[in-house]
């Protein structure tokens, strides 16, 4: 509240939109941005990857910044003639009251699954859920995924009207006739809309999972007057850096960079890509050092079960030995019949993946996503997977 007053209550000069959920926050946030910009709005973003104010892109470390920073960003956005801000609202942000005192115009809930539970985050799933549910006590209009198993718990104490979206016929906005579409450097999904919006949508983000992200964004955009024609223009070629990001290679396989860095996210993307029925699905990933060992076992087992071939490599080893992390991943991998190879150096691992990809394959580089560094022994070294891919294609690896 003090921060809001200090900056002259800038939130009152903007249409404020908050997106919360375990998965899909970033994708949905940028979908909302694209949809509203197609209709002529100037949209600021406060997200996991960055803060966007006009042409300025500011890298960030926390999903939800401190209260002072949020209102500082709001003020800069208002001064840059933004009329809308979309922000990712994390459970930690609600727990630590970083968004206290902001009455969002629109609040959007994507989904909920166990994550961020531990000594430095939430003590248990019940606390995690209750923090997410705070959004619907802090907005004027709420939008929620009716297909999520925790929908009823998330919305039961809402103090705002809730509009629903999903594949469920009882939703206010329903997607139907969902169809996956594929070309060499394109994976997408088409679907019809009925309810609060009517028409056909072609979305350039892979998987039925992203139908829910699109529906959430469309719900808000429709409320703000965006037409179905404008929605299609925005979504057909939509992409978010490091989130199921297709990287063109010029070859007859599909290469994807994705931020999936835990078992839930890896399982989700591998199932999503398997639905496109590739001859082979190749998964490349590592796990962060000085983090939960359980995550390593789980990710190894998930990839072993769901990918045709796994390349186990380094992520951010931090202060651990990369080989020790790989050995932990192998404990999970060896519970399965999955084929694998381990290559410690991530550059070499990516080179191996591209040189061994065959026509029709889908190759996913998981874990790093938008990150452009590798953290080793307390130092962050520059490492961009897009640049590595280009180097491989240019024959440097």
Regions inferred by a protein language model and the residue ranges of each:
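Phosphate-binding loop of NTP-binding sites
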Residues: 1-146, 150-158
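Acidic, Mg2+-coordinating active-site environments of NTP-dependent enzymes
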Residues: 14, 78-80, 95, 105-255, ...
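Short glycine/serine/threonine-rich phosphate/pyrophosphate-binding segments
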Residues: 25-31, 89, 93-94, 211-214, ...
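Generic beta-sheet signal
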Residues: 46, 110, 145, 165-167, ...
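Short, small-residue-rich loop/turn micro-motifs
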Residues: 47-50, 111, 193-195, 367-369
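Short gly/pro/ser/thr-enriched loop/turn and capping motifs at secondary-structure boundaries
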Residues: 50-53, 114-118, 170-175, 318-319, ...
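Short SAM/SAH-binding signature in class I
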Residues: 84, 105-106, 216, 358-364
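ATP-dependent carboxylate-amine ligase
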Residues: 159, 196, 219-233, 239-240, ...
């Amino acid at each position: 509240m003090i921060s809001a007053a200090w900056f002259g209550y800038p939130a009152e000069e903007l249409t404020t939109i908050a997106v919360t959920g375990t998965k899909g926050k970033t994708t949905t946030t940028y979908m909302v941005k694209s949809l509203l910009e197609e209709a002529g709005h100037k949209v600021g973003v406060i997200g996991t990857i960055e803060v966007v104010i006009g042409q300025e892109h500011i890298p960030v470390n926390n999903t939800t910044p401190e209260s002072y920073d949020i209102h500082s960003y709001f003020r800069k956005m208002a001064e840059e003639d933004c009329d809308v801000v979309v922000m990712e609202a994390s459970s930690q942000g609600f727990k630590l009251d970083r968004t206290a005192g902001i009455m969002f115009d629109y609040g959007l809930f994507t989904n909920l699954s166990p994550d961020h539970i531990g000594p430095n985050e939430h003590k248990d799933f019940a606390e995690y859920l209750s923090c997410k549910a705070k959004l619907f006590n802090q907005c004027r209009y709420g939008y929620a995924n009716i297909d999520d198993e925790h929908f009823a718990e998330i919305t039961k104490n809402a103090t705002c009207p809730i509009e629903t979206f999903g594949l469920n016929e009882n939703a206010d906005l329903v997607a139907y006739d969902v169809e996956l579409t594929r070309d060499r450097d394109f994976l997408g999904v088409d679907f019809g809309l009925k309810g609060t919006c009517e028409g056909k949508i072609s979305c350039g983000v892979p998987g039925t999972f992203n139908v829910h992200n699109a529906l959430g964004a469309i719900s808000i955009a429709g409320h703000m007057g965006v037409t179905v024609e404008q929605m299609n223009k925005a979504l057909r070629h939509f992409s978010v850096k490091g989130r199921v990001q297709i990287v063109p290679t010029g070859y007859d396989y599909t290469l994807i960079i994705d931020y999936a860095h835990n078992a839930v996210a890896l399982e989700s993307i591998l199932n999503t890509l398997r639905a496109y029925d590739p001859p082979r699905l190749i998964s490349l990933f590592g796990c962060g050092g000085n983090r939960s060992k359980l995550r390593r076992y789980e990710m190894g087992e998930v990839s072993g079960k769901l990918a045709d071939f796994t390349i186990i490599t380094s992520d951010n080893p931090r202060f651990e030995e990369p080989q020790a992390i790989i050995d932990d991943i192998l404990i999970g991998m060896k519970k399965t019949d999955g084929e694998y190879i381990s290559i410690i150096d991530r550059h070499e691992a990516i080179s191996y993946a591209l040189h061994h990809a065959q026509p029709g394959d889908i190759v996913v580089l998981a874990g790093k996503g938008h990150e452009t560094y590798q953290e080793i022994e307390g130092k962050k070294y520059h490492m961009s997977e897009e640049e590595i891919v280009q180097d491989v294609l240019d024959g440097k690896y």
